[in-house]
Amino acid sequence: MILVTTAGKIGAEASRLLAQRGAPVRVLVRNPEKVPALAQAGVDVCRGDLEVSATIDAAMQDVTSVVLVSPAIPRQELNVIASAVRARVQHVVKIMSKASADSPIARRRGQFEIEQGLIASGLGYTLLKNNAYMQNFLMMARAIAETSSFGTATGDGRIGHVDARDIAAVAAAIAASPAAHMGKTYWPTGPEVLSSTDVAAVFSRVLGRTVTFHPITVAQQKQAMLDVGLSGERGRGQCQRRCADGKGRL
């Protein structure tokens, strides 16, 4: 059994791909009724909460591999790692981005704490340190549709955006056959590095009308994250990453 720890854009796709290839797969979610398509695809949808160790332990029964993907809150992911140790899981595929103990970005310090906890656990592991997701632009879809413009705090920073579906496919493949990937770290990225102005040019070409980019302040970026429904903690993390991208710190 392979356990996927959330059903977000990567977790849901990884679960679907594993079920499609006939692998036994379970996904841990707070509200199973919100993911009927996964159950219909043959995924074992298990109710649980990454804050509650007992529910993680229940989901970890008979699991050999874990795809660890979540908003990267250290206490939650360390709960999963501890549960995997108790269940004698063989391998963990950790989805993450950049990690550093002394980063000015809280999310990256948190990622470092999780990474070190996984390495110290004695579990087999693979780290996928992916670049920024292309799908993050969907948060700006309404603004682009209504104003033919979008703003971020990235400035002139250039990023190799990667498709979250590709990350899901890589994670699923490793979780299903982990032997060749034990202890490895991979850095998935997109095929080219693009500034926000470059991205606006792509939107213009595809949509057949002019789309422009305008820089915004850190405060405006933070509010934009909250406006599209991100929690305060996740919104701050995304905002800090955008600002770091703009300063060439990616």
Where are these predicted regions, by residue range?
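Oxidoreductase cofactor-interface core, primarily capturing Rossmann-like NAD(P)-dependent enzymes
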Residues: M1-Q40, E51-A54, A58-S65, S70-H91, ...
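Short alpha-helical scaffolding segments that buttress acidic/His motifs in well-ordered protein cores
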Residues: G237-R242
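Conserved SAM-binding strand-loop segment of SAM-dependent methyltransferases
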Residues: D44-R47
